[in-house]
Amino acid sequence: MSKKLIIAEKPSVANDIARALGGFTRHGDYYERDDYVLSSAIGHLLELVAPEKYEVKRGKWSFANLPVIPPQFDLRPIERSEDRLKVLQKLMKRKDVTAFVNACDAGREGELIFRYIVQHSKLNKPVERLWLQSMTQNAIRDGFASLRADKTMLPLADAAICRSESDWLIGINGTRAMTAFNSKEGGFYKTTVGRVQTPTLTILVEREERIRKFKARDYWEVHALFSVAAGEYTGRWFDESHGKLGKSDDEHARAERLWNEASATALQSRCVGKPGVVEEESKPTTQSSPQLYDLTTLQREANSRFGFSARNTLGLAQALYEKHKVLTYPRTDARCLPEDYLATVGETLEMLSDLNTCGGAYSSLAKAVIKNKWVKPNKRIFNNEKISDHFAIIPTLQAPKNLSEPEQKLYDLVVKRFLAVFYPPAEFLVTTRITRIDGEPFKSEGKVMKEPGWLSVYGREAGTEDGNILVAVTDGKAVTESIEVKAFQTRPPARFSEATLLSAMEGAGKLVDDEELREAMSEKGLGTPATRAAVIEGLLQEDYIHRNGRELQPTPKAFSLMFALRHFGITELASPELTGDWEYKLKQMEQGKLPRAEFMNHITELTQDMVSRIKTGEIPDTAFQTLSTPCPKCQGVVQENYRRFQCQSCDFAVWKVMGSREYGHEEVEELIRNGVVGPLQGFRSRLGRPFAAMVRLSKEFKAEFDFGQGNDDENAEPVDFTGQEALGSCPKCQSAVYEHELSYTCEKAIGPGRSCDFRTGRIILQRQIERDQVKKLLETGKTDLLHRFISKKGRPFSAFLVRGADGKIGFEFAPRAEKSRKGKASTETKETEIAGDNGLKAVSVSAPAAAKKAAKDTKTLKPIEPAATLKTAKTASKKVPKKVASNRPAKKPT
């Protein structure tokens, strides 16, 4: 009897199909019944390669062998999944298998996986297509009752194959051409490029360029403290005309900012001591829950909440899906569920309401949804039009057991979002109060939750403040207690974290000017939810970016690539427009409006043009600077070029990048002039760990690291501190302490005849310690509160440096700041919020609670018992007033 072979994309789908259709017997990696054989791939099983005669070894990545544009491609099994491919090939070649059913995912990539498997088999058997939008058993049975003819799927297959081949052509040729260019002077400098990778890198580099060019600007705010019968509240002056004449060209302009101190102090003088006239408006508002998770939003949330990388989140979600079977398919870009999924949602809620599920953690929350019948048709949740290959990530009917801590955290995120989406909106009462002093407006805002709605899933209760609570004003009048002028500085744009970079990749279509191309990218962005984590990891592995805590910072290699691409005029490779153009044309192809050959001809021309520009490209010396300091070896002229600072008369050269750090021009000038520079921060070890070092020119005029250990040798030359200013007395032996190389050190602690060991770093945990702070430390035993220490785990913290009784230097942490008095509305919370949203630069007076732990990361210092537990980061910022004027009467002695 003839049978059809069903090929699913992954084993879990094969299991679902077997259960839905019934009657199958399992035989290892496949199922069988009278009319069907059923098995699956494990994602992609094959990858594109050029035919052998077109392929070259890595050492032959020269321009002579480029471009590589084969007339057709071969397929190569992916090593890790080759065994599964052999299983499928054996089943496909069975004589009783007379046709295939493509049950891979309903989309471009699912089509590609199946087409490559069939192409590799070299078999020509009839094909039918199972097209599913839902994995319920009824949906699967309905799908098999209406299988699609293969000819209707050919346009989608063409688009899938074109996407794969064009990515190969651009990526392989671009990478080999840029590698050949960067290796012209010898060596092998692999320089990867790609359709998604390079525009993503451009986003990071352009942000870093903005940060480097940024110049802080001073501005001032005027704050007032008012009192009424019920208590006190604060207000901030604002310009009522701001924004009424259109959007300002100044990106830092805000209604509350004054750009010269004189205006601020004049405003203060006009208002001090005068009464306030109060007007206010209170109105109810609602806030709906966020939509269900797709992979990108889950990765963003997990990165923001727990610091999980995009790759780690994907791995955890995949384990929860495949191993534990407690989440639905995670590699999705949909945030809705199928319209026929209401019954399944009800069953899932019943599972979550069980007290045995996660110790009853979700029981009361799930029961509330069931009791109130909140699951009902709602296009925001159940919408077939918003589903592509897969639906949103939600819990399955399987109760979790034996989850690891990270797995439990991610599962909890998904479950709570799933529950919250069915709850009613949260309800708030928002009050906006304007207090006018001599006509000048001061704004105060308050927000109180009336009904928590979906926020009750996250532990919020009615009556709690959500921002500031404003005390009541009964007669429309307020006493002005004080007026403060506060000074701030604008801050540069924040570097991307994985969470914000994922958002930028998802919304990259907004960067495209062409309307049709922007529309083509509107749903996809750069990459797909399943590939974005790999793109970020690829940039890390290729040394294009580094992780600094949660920040992603482009390396000199990234800037070098962008500089070259811009110089060669290959701007399309570095912008999202290439992806937009491809998506637009591939969608036309899916609709049968664009022939495959026409698209590939365009890609071939693009590839040839790209290689030609790189091959013939030259970066003239006029694009770089000539140093003013002569060559230390021959006194010749030292000229900067693409990779080095090179003497024009001899072989002396300093590489522009050392230890993953690029020299500044002033640093190279100092190195050549003095033979030493530093200490410099920002170097990285081969393990990616940051370090600081001096850099010296050796006797052979080679730049080398110097970690300041040369004077520890008993046979070393004595150090002459004549002419240097002593910073204070050594806490151990009372000798003089001087600045020396990487340390502040006792004069008796270096050179021959050492009798003391006092030494403390000039740079501690990536923070430079200023001379005046060392003087204060030696004199008083304690520095000022110092900010911007960075632990080895990337945690920023603030601390005092203190001198212990034994002379050793350690950390002491700031006392916990008192909470504001109840009934007094404070602008502190609001200002901290502005610090995140509007670039405010506030002075922090405390540090994260993790600072004590973070301080232990250093070997330079040992922590001293902290003076107090620390305040959390979110409430740490306080502003230092520039000037204070008050008409508050002095208190009488009691």
Give residue spans per PLM region.
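Intrinsically disordered, low-complexity regulatory segments
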Residues: 1-172, 251-252, 492
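Metal- or metallocofactor-binding catalytic centers and their adjacent structured scaffolds
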Residues: 247-293, 509, 667
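C-terminal helical "lid" subdomain and adjoining coupling/linker elements of P-loop NTPases
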Residues: 185-188, 192, 204-259, 305
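C-terminal or mid-to-C-terminal helical accessory/interaction module adjacent to the motor/catalytic core
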Residues: 139-224, 283
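Basic, low-complexity terminal or inter-domain segments flanking catalytic cores
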Residues: 2-5, 27, 81, 92, ...
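Conserved short loop/turn motifs at secondary-structure junctions
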Residues: 2-5, 103-106, 187-190, 282-291, ...
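Glycine-centered, phosphate/nucleic-acid-interacting loop/turn motifs that mediate DNA/RNA or nucleotide
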Residues: 324-325, 543
